Amino acid sequence: MKQLMWRGGQSIPFSREVARADSTVETEGSEMVDQAALARRFPKNFTWGFGTAAYQIEGATKEDGRGESIWDRFATIPGKTHNGESGEPACDSYHRWREDIAVLKELGATAYRFSIAWPRILPNGTGAVNQKGLAWYEQFVDGLLEAGIEPFPTLYHWDLPQALQDRGGWPSRDTAQAFADYASIVIGALGDRVTRWSTLNEPLCSAWLGYLSGDMAPGIEDAQAAFSASHHLLLGHGLAVRAARTARPNLEMGIVMNVGPAIPASDSPEDRDAARRADLTDSHWFHDPVYLGSYPQEVIDFSGVTMPIQSDDMKIISERLDWHGLNYYFPAKIADDPNGDGARTHWGHIDGPKTDMGWGIDASVMRDFLIKLKTHWKTPKIYITENGSAWPDSVAPDGRIYDPEREQYLMEHLNAAAEAIEAGVDLRGYFGWSLLDNYEWAYGYAKRFGYAYVDYPTQTRTIKESGRAFSRLIRASRGG
């Protein structure tokens, strides 16, 4: 059953590039990318932003009444995170949020995607509200608005209160209702200032990596628990959408899904069918119930699990949405594994350069998946809510951070996004991952995704050269 976990990748060749003063990028063995021309392919009202998550940047895990999260507990288990590192102090954004807003302004961002820490609002998951936690997000949202930056919050980005995990976590149906109650509290407080909300970030990772492979918090390896968690995550999403619209009828509600689209390892019928099965357990398992109202029955059959579906659950899960968020980093190379269980697939990587995460690169797969969202699931308007790459960045003697690989990755994927728009996809925005280098979950502080470099001993933020290139493109797109 572990074979269901989200893994794999594909890459395309590229080499180091040289940033030029005339806003082009020259790559050895390839044509020059005209960033100004690329910028003109996006509408002037296109949303340009950056993303983070509360546990990855805030720190202050024991301040002002915040409760323990499953990631706080997970990081104490030997061997679960790099060097036993946790989200304390991360980027210390709880205290340095004004610095983060200044970085956003310098980059030219029009929006900022961040998450709200459930344990900071409800330390026990339910019950009494921690007013200090709520007040912190209120001042932060006000700070963004004063800077002319649209807040784009996520209600849940993997930091379940440990108290709820102790009572069963996402495999328990009670957690879905607890999430809806939490959503009502937050939206009741901030919904007068924030228009666009996402309920969940990447329920696939919460379920498959948290409860199936055990690679992420809470570190459980149980197939039945994982499938129950997947259902209750989506049920919580639907209940939260209903609760939000009850509290604030004019909000725009969405969900954020990650995908690693399956590429067959060969043209053999066996590998092609393995890729189909992999997509069923990845994108279809989470998209189908939200947009089509049902789970892929084939996955239930070959997994041998019992789904805890009750009357009206699928109607709640498929509640109408206003927008859809796509998180894309890499595709997966899939081969048939006749000796495996579950999906009987082998996940791997093709030859070629990889990011510092070991992930392959193919922007065309993102373009094709954007088109699939439109044609197969008929999603509402779409935002690319995460897309980015990690590289082994370092500060040069002149104090700058030269990261041409990240810039090339960005431009290739923005080109793919523009191609999707030209193919008729209603794509409204792009959020680069990430605003800052930060705590990369089980990888600790070993991987850097930021467009701004964080010197962790001093917490100094320095915009990387890729961030400056991105900023030029944003301003060109907006006519600046």
Q: Where are the language model's segments positioned?
A:
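Active-site region of glycoside hydrolase catalytic domains
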Residues: 28-81, 124-126, 134-480
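Glycine-rich, proline-tolerant flexible connector loops at the mouths of alpha/beta enzymes
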Residues: 116-129
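Active-site mouth loops of central-metabolism enzymes
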Residues: 82-95
